[in-house]
Amino acid sequence: MKVSYECGPCFLRQAREALDLSTDDDELKMDVMEEIFKFLSDNFKLGANSNSTGSAMHNLVKQKTGCIDPYRKEKIEGNEIALKYLPDVKKIIDEDDSLENYVKIAIIGNILDFGAFTLDDDIERVIKSSLKKDLTIKDIDEFENSLKTNDKVLYLVDNTGEIVFDKLLLAKIKEYGLDITIAVKSEPILNDACMVDALDAGLDEFGEIVEIGCGTVGYVDSQISDEFREIFNNHKFIISKGMGNYEGLTEIDLSNKEVYFLLCAKCGTISRDIGVNLHDMLLFKK
């Protein structure tokens, strides 16, 4: 996906956030922010790839501050809080164990910022109210048909915290008898899930966890490893979580694949690209 004018303020917000998490040295923050402005001045242009631009910016922060995983604390806390609520979520979904509700739970995980919740927050209320919302795009019948007609699936996860709720959908997928391969980032980027995060959340219970070979914002086809490219090419059925993976996968030819995107349209650029409203929950085939 290409950048829009709205991506500019978002990049700067992310840069400030990453800097605040990386260092307390205000002088260093200023120096790095100056370099980020120079980088964006040279690279933030019409036709630029959004994921590649964001990845390079975050790597600049890591390189200059020496902090390779600025979001580590937030990632650990996100998983811990989500795991704490998982039994309650299971009870909620037991009231209606339709495939659509499992999909909704996985998308709700994408909506919730687990790092912003405490153990006293009424997350159960948030989940129940979200489950009552309809999916704006709901290719659920095609999705179930793919579950029934394929023998394996590649599942591209997104953030920590969110991956805990993915466990429920992964368990549901296992009921269809599919072999599941779960793809995570090889290096830290934002609060995206890496191998250690996926193992901490228990995703290895559902299938083999593989690394994509890079630490990019979302999916960047030019940077994945040869090993992961072979895995990707050998899977016809792919489930993609979150906006970053949508931005990257829509840059490549998917005509010979069954790719389903599960996400909440939290960004104006992406909501317009898909043709939905901001904050809509979506399951759609591309």
List the predicted regions and their residue ranges:
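Electropositive, gly/pro-rich neighborhoods at or near active sites that engage anionic ligands
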Residues: 2-150
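Conserved catalytic alpha/beta core of Sir2/sirtuin-type deacylases, generalized to analogous enzyme cores
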Residues: 111-130, 135-136, 186-195, 201-206, ...
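Short, basic, glycine/proline-bearing loop/turn elements
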Residues: 127-129, 154-156, 209-217
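Residues at the starts of beta-strands that form the adenosine-phosphate
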Residues: 151-152, 178-182, 258
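Structural motif
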Residues: 152-154, 236-237
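Histidine-anchored nucleotide/phosphate-binding helix
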Residues: 160-182
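Short amphipathic alpha-helical segments
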Residues: 167-168, 195, 250-253
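C-terminal functional extensions of proteins
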Residues: 184-186, 190, 199-286
